[in-house]
């Protein structure tokens, strides 16, 4: 019995058109779970805005991490790994932006089957 580990990398970008936006990751496919090891985020335009991370899926949004104030430098967001179940997503809620702000969020981790192969 061995476990197949599939690297997970996702990049979300946004050019703000107003003060608030939500970015959503791809959902975890059926039969798998996803471990997020790192989230880094930057407002590449200016040091302004805030971000909250929510776990979404199955009709709910669960607040995951405390509010972070954005800067132009890359900021690490996680203090420990985060595990998502089938069909769950992460939602990045951005507030306090100005139209034209360029936001970039990078996720790294891995997917693995719920049942060993």
Q: PLM features: residue spans?
A:
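C-terminal interaction-tip segments
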Residues: 1-34, 38, 44, 95-117
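Solvent-exposed serine/threonine-rich low-complexity stretches and specific carbohydrate-binding patches
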Residues: 10-13, 62-70
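Solvent-exposed, conformationally flexible loop/turn segments
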Residues: 14-21, 69-75, 87
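Exposed aromatic-hydrophobic patches
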Residues: 23-26, 74-81
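Hydrophobic beta-strand core residues of beta-sandwich domains
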Residues: 28, 68-70, 84, 97
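Short, surface-exposed beta-strand/strand-loop-strand elements in extracellular ectodomains
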Residues: 46-63
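Short aromatic-acidic-glycine turn motif
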Residues: 60-64, 114-117
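Noncatalytic modules at the cell exterior or secretory-pathway interfaces
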Residues: 81-98
